[in-house]
Swiss-Prot record:
Its EC number is 1.2.1.41. GO terms for cellular component: cytoplasm. Pathway: Amino-acid biosynthesis; L-proline biosynthesis; L-glutamate 5-semialdehyde from L-glutamate: step 2/2. Catalyzes the NADPH-dependent reduction of L-glutamate 5-phosphate into L-glutamate 5-semialdehyde and phosphate. The product spontaneously undergoes cyclization to form 1-pyrroline-5-carboxylate. This is Gamma-glutamyl phosphate reductase. NCBIfam families: PRK00197.1 (NF001221), proA (TIGR00407). GO terms for biological process: L-proline biosynthetic process. Belongs to the gamma-glutamyl phosphate reductase family. The gene is proA. It comes from Salmonella agona (strain SL483). It is an enzyme of class 1 (oxidoreductase).
């Protein structure tokens, strides 16, 4: 089954690569229109997925990731329309020039070909990835989690209907709807057909892909994000940033999970933090110093060492007191996932040091980690947030779904 999907996807990719920007945008507009027209069928499938997930005991954080509402689906359709407004990188001449030999050389952006994406309980990923791949002339094979298989299947049917209406092969966007996990291992070995693989899920999925895939893999999306409250931090705006980074949408990968507090500000800052977190419904997981200093009003539990490596994806926050900047940077190096980390400070020397020494995809000064997002960065919808260094890093927009080729123009030109 998968080999036939791969053959069809590869054939579709050759046709997509020849489309003009206008032709690709017309397809995306049609997809957005169909998502709204077929909203009832998609939401009906999603209700079934959510009910089964709840019966299976999924956490509230996971259920939130899984759930679609009319407003969320409308926003997804609008995101597709926003992709239409983005500049198409395909065909862009990155650099080049006339060589001494007389050869005119160009380095030109081209589609990757076929992209494979394995993801878990995020139904919006289906549309986000499909729209970005189509905009860049790539075919895509999707393998969503079993928790969303009905929603994904309904969504892909809508996308394929739009493709067919525009005279394009339905195989340009395909989904593996069989929940059999063995198919993931088979997909990981489809290097004959898939040019790049993107896993979006937990650490186990990323480890499996890194160890078993014969396809180039881009990993990311695991966000054990930190905020360091420096000794010079202004407490009121610091609290505002922390509330945003923790509570705006706790189930996202750019949500802060660990707060590092400089010991020189701890006795002044921690009581204010506790009051604010109590109002926000956040449970604090405190180290020994925090447990000694705080006695309410926020719910406070002792920090377990293994929690420093956890994505809570819920209203839980580790709080650790560190001796100095070295302690904060060392902690992030040991427990961070190179996703998004921030410093809150009024000392620009310390800010510069933090930016230079914290090796994460996104580093912030006096700002929330929640900004690590394709839309917020002006990239449009994102296919993933890469926490590695090749071939993309941070929110992966359109350019990350392209490669390049060298093109030489001669006139009977030969090498001397």
């Amino acid at each position: 089954m998968l080999e036939q999907m791969g053959i069809a996807a590869k054939a579709a990719s050759y046709k997509l690569a020849l489309l003009s920007s206008g032709e690709k945008n017309r397809v995306l507009e049609k997809i957005a229109d169909e998502l709204e027209a077929q909203m009832e069928s998609i939401l009906s499938a999603n209700v079934q997925d959510v009910e089964q997930a709840r019966d299976n005991g999924l956490s509230e954080a996971m259920l939130d990731r899984l759930t679609l509402t009319p407003a969320r689906l409308k926003a997804i359709a609008d995101d597709v329309r926003q992709v239409c407004n983005l500049a198409d990188p395909v065909g862009q001449v990155i650099d080049g020039g006339l060589l001494d030999s007389g050869l005119r050389l160009e380095r030109r952006r081209v589609p990757l070909g076929v992209v494979g994406v394995i993801y878990e309980a995020r139904p919006n990923v289906t549309v986000d990835v499909a729209s970005l791949c189509l905009k860049t002339g790539n075919a895509v094979i999707l393998r969503g989690g079993k928790e969303t298989h009905r929603t994904n299947a309904a969504t892909v049917r809508v996308i394929q209907k739009a493709l067919k209406a525009c005279g394009l092969p339905e195989a340009a966007v395909q989904a593996i709807d069989n929940p059999d996990r063995s198919l993931v291992n088979e997909m990981l070995r489809m290097d004959k057909y898939i040019d790049m693989l993107i896993p979006r899920g937990g650490a186990g999925l990323h480890k499996l892909c890194r160890e078993q895939s014969t396809i180039p893999v881009i990993t990311g999306g695991i966000g054990v994000c930190h905020i360091f409250v420096d000794s010079s931090a202004d407490i009121a705006p610091a609290l505002k940033i922390i509330v945003n980074a923790k509570t705006q949408r706790p189930s996202t990968c750019n949500t802060v999970e660990t707060l590092l507090v400089h010991q020189d500000i701890a006795e002044r800052f921690l009581p204010a933090l506790s009051k604010q977190m109590a109002e926000s419904g956040v449970t604090l997981h405190g180290d020994e110093t925090v447990m000694q200093v705080l006695h309410g009003p926020a719910k406070l539990v002792p920090l377990k060492p293994e929690e420093l490596d956890n994505e809570f994806l819920s209203l839980d926050l580790n709080v650790v007191v560190v001796e100095n900047m070295d302690g904060a940077i060392g902690h992030i190096r040991e427990h961070g996932t190179q996703h998004s980390d921030a410093i809150l400070t009024c000392d620009m020397h310390n800010a510069a040091r933090f930016v230079n020494e914290v090796d994460s995809a996104a580093v912030y000064v006096n700002a929330s980690t929640r900004f690590t997002d394709g839309g917020q960065f002006g990239l449009g919808a994102e296919v993933a947030v890469s926490t590695q260094k090749l071939h993309a890093r941070g929110p992966m927009g359109l350019e990350a779904l392209t490669t390049y080729k060298w093109i030489g123009f001669g006139d009977g030109t030969i090498r001397a």
